[in-house]
Amino acid sequence: MKKILIDSGPLIALFDRSDKYHQASTEFIKKNRSELITTLASVTEVLHLLDFNRNAQVDFLSWVDAGAVTVETITTDDFQSIRELIVKYSDLPMDFADACLVFLGEKMNISKVATIDRDFDVYKLKGKRSFTTYVK
């Protein structure tokens, strides 16, 4: 099965009906046939930004627990590479969650990302390959 990275933005929008990207995120999820891949950093970001609605947080966790998205492990062994990405893109700046996704893209050879973050138009994978972005 093909894989696609998913950033926190579409996940937040999916569980927040008032978000301006809710409809686009919902349509993406309905049409998507690829395995969704994210990181614990993105999951944490989603839960933090959904903190205004406990039910949305619980629904999101249930959705993840049901296997709707695969949460890949980032270990301290990966921190050097992640730190290098944060330094490389310090002018944006790149946050830890985005750096983890770019790192996973490189590690797992995934160049597709569901995001509303325009920074993914700037981020490059090894070999200067661009990400193909969805949702935004």
Region locations from a protein language model:
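PIN-domain endoribonuclease scaffold, especially VapC-family toxins
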Residues: K2-I4, Q23-P93, F103, K107-S111, ...
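Conserved glycosyltransferase catalytic-site signature
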Residues: S8, D98-A99
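Short, flexible helix/strand-to-coil boundary loops that buttress conserved ligand/catalytic motifs
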Residues: F15, D117, K124-G127
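A secondary-structure boundary/capping signal
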Residues: D7-S8, T39, I116
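Metal-dependent nucleic-acid phosphoesterase active-site entry motif
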Residues: M1-D19
